[in-house]
Design a protein with these regions (language model features):
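N-terminal secretory signal peptides that target proteins for export/translocation
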Residues: 1-2
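Acidic, glycine/proline-rich Ca2+-coordinating loop motifs
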Residues: 5-8, 14-17, 21-616
């Protein structure tokens, strides 16, 4: 296995020995892991811990809306489990609803069919206050919930989730918005339902109880002709025989955090991607998988039978350095896919020899080591691919040299420096030369924004590629590719003028002509948070700030953004598209999944999962 690190200092060796001894002890041997208060703590530590617990307790810190949301979450979770099992009765409903509760039908009697093809049917409905009269009692609510779930066959694969997305504390009761999701087998295939309910609760009860529930919207997607889902989990059939999968990839990050030292780059807040390309020219796509520090990156070659072979070591690409992203692209126009890696050591370039191995051709080192995303583009139309590199946090060197401002969550401008590396071909010693032309071409404007992703596209149809950059804390950037008076490439930052600043936690970018009007549209992956949606609407949230800044924070938690390209008029955000709910959208991609000629959207989302569901 390859690593750029030189010999570890003696002090780290000693620390490693101590760590091995420590981690070999059982959990009950550890004073930090044993039940009860920690044995090794000072009075001040215990006092600080108690104060922190009080601040985290919404009831003690004055956040009554969050205290209510926490109290209502438990009965809602139980109700969701009962809905999944089916046949709700008055007894189950009485645990969460008042005896005199008011309810309406949660499933529309005549839903609107908005799509039908040989594979899927989509039904949708919105509800009006005048649609029907309220019905009284828990029996009516039980009947409404049973009717809602009537098309889903109850079984072990049935899933139901209920989450509170807004809370308003009123004297007459607590008003909430509840997001509803359910899925399972139907009569012909698989069914997925989503919806939104408006609920009023009794505030003074020890256990919150619903006094009224009214539907706001409902949608149902049903697959036809087959009991199989659209996507099948083929992990075991493809990777199951691989030792790399059994001993490495089958374990989550939480497993390795307790086994590999931080000094190797094993951290919670690392993000690792992958690259797909035909490495050996056999017409089959292969996969390069980036890994956290201390774990070898993996190259899997696809076999004719659909399985993969791990050739990482033989190919010379099993680097141990923390690697955030990779590209498989032809950099020297020889018809073979070369490898580019974004590592903590810098951007590593390896050329494909054509015999199943890779050789090092360049290592581009920056002051900033928090390198995130890579993209390849021929920005200057000279016939070879150049590289664009995004960076999240700035190094101490950059901060001192540039005198960067302090961190500002909603509009951070203290991040690392993104780089455009021009491909200048081979040098005298055989290495490939990549020249930093960031400032030269105008890409150093708004270039300290904690960038996580970037994507190139000719959005203005003028024949050259423009650049959109998604930034983690605040406004994103759109750089239009143009020419200066001398005819040289010069980018202009035009996000505000084009209407695509999109304040948020930008994590991913994808372009496609989703409405088939001849212009490329933009989809930006951000963060959706139910807790954030509740908190940012409360009067207690940032009470001394301006309304515009509060609105910015509310936007941060709304989810993803779809922008329609209206040509000379710029872009317009399409709020009614239904594409906002992507959760924590680390990656988003336009793709025509069903080959109907219309672009669909795939979103990879989530966060670290541990055995403790409360441990985020």
């Amino acid at each position: 296995m390859r690593n750029k690190k030189i010999l570890v200092p003696l002090a780290l060796v000693a620390a490693a020995i101590v760590a091995v001894v420590w981690w070999s002890r059982s959990p009950t041997d550890s004073p930090m892991l044993a039940d009860g208060p920690a044995l090794l703590s000072t009075p001040q530590t215990r006092q600080d811990a108690a104060a922190l617990r009080d601040r985290m307790d919404p009831a003690k810190s004055g956040w009554q809306s969050e205290a209510f949301a926490e109290a209502a979450a438990a009965p809602l979770k139980k109700l969701a489990m009962q809905m999944a099992r089916g046949d709700l009765g008055q007894e189950e409903i009485a645990e969460i609803a008042d005896a005199g509760c008011l309810s309406r039908a949660l499933r529309p009697r005549q839903p609107r069919e908005i799509r039908r093809d040989p594979h899927v049917v989509v039904r949708r409905a919105t509800f009006d206050e005048s649609d029907e009269a309220d019905k009284l009692g828990t029996e009516s609510l039980a009947a409404a919930l049973n009717a809602l779930m009537s098309t889903i066959v109850k079984g072990t694969e049935t899933r139901v989730k209920l989450k509170i997305t807004s809370v308003e504390m009123r004297p007459e009761g607590v008003e909430t918005t509840i997001a509803y999701e359910a899925s399972g087998r139907g009569s012909t295939g698989w069914i997925q339902q989503t919806g939104e309910w408006h609920c009023v609760w009794k505030q003074d009860a020890a256990t919150p109880r619903i006094v009224s529930i009214r539907p706001h919207r409902w949608e149902e997607v049903e697959t036809l002709q087959s009991e199989r889902r659209w996507m099948s989990d083929c992990t075991q059939s493809v990777l199951g025989a691989s030792v790399a999968f059994k001993q490495q990839l089958s374990y989550g990050l939480d497993h390795w955090l307790g086994r590999i030292e931080r000094s190797h780059g094993m951290l919670y807040f690392r993000r690792q991607g992958l690259a797909v390309g035909d490495v050996n020219g056999d017409g089959l796509d292969d996969v390069y998988v980036c890994q956290a520090g201390g774990l070898p990156n993996r190259l899997f070659l696809q076999q004719a039978d659909g399985t993969v072979a791990d050739v990482s070591r033989a190919a010379g690409v099993d680097w141990l350095d923390s690697t955030s992203s990779a590209l498989l692209v032809d950099l020297n126009n020889d018809g073979r896919q070369d490898l580019v890696l974004a590592t903590a050591a810098g951007v590593l370039v390896q050329f494909n020899r054509g015999d199943g191995t890779f050789g090092r051709r360049a290592l581009v080192v920056f002051d900033d080591s928090d390198v995130q995303a890579l993209s390849a583009v021929d920005y200057d139309n000279d016939g070879d691919l150049d590289l664009y590199v995004t960076v999240d946090f700035a190094s101490g060197t950059t901060r001192r040299r540039e005198g960067l401002p302090g961190f500002l969550y909603h509009d951070a401008n203290d991040g690392g420096i993104n780089r455009l590396l021009r491909n200048d071909g081979g040098g005298k010693n055989g290495d490939w030369v990549f020249t930093d032309v960031t400032a030269e071409v105008g890409l150093d404007t708004h270039n300290r924004r904690h960038s996580l992703a970037a994507s190139w596209e000719d959005y203005d149809n003028d024949g050259d590629l423009d650049l959109y950059v998604a930034n983690d804390y605040g406004q994103n950037c759109l750089y239009r590719n143009g020419r200066d008076a001398s005819g040289n490439v010069r980018f202009e930052e035009v996000a505000e003028a084009a209407g695509v600043v999109d304040f948020g936690s930008g994590m991913s970018v994808s372009w496609a002509d989703y409405n088939r009007d001849g212009r490329m549209d933009l989809y930006v992956g951000n963060m959706f948070s139910t807790a954030g949606s509740r908190i940012t609407t409360q009067d207690r949230f940032l009470p001394n700030t301006t309304p515009s800044r509060r609105a910015l924070y509310r936007r941060f938690v709304k989810g993803n953004s779809l922008y329609r390209n209206d040509g000379p008029k710029g872009f317009r955000e399409v709020d009614h598209s239904g594409a906002a709910m992507g959760r924590w959208a680390w990656s988003s991609q336009f793709a025509d999944l069903d080959n109907d000629g219309w672009e669909d959207i795939v979103v990879a989302n989530g966060y670290i999962t541990t055995d403790d569901p409360g441990d985020l």
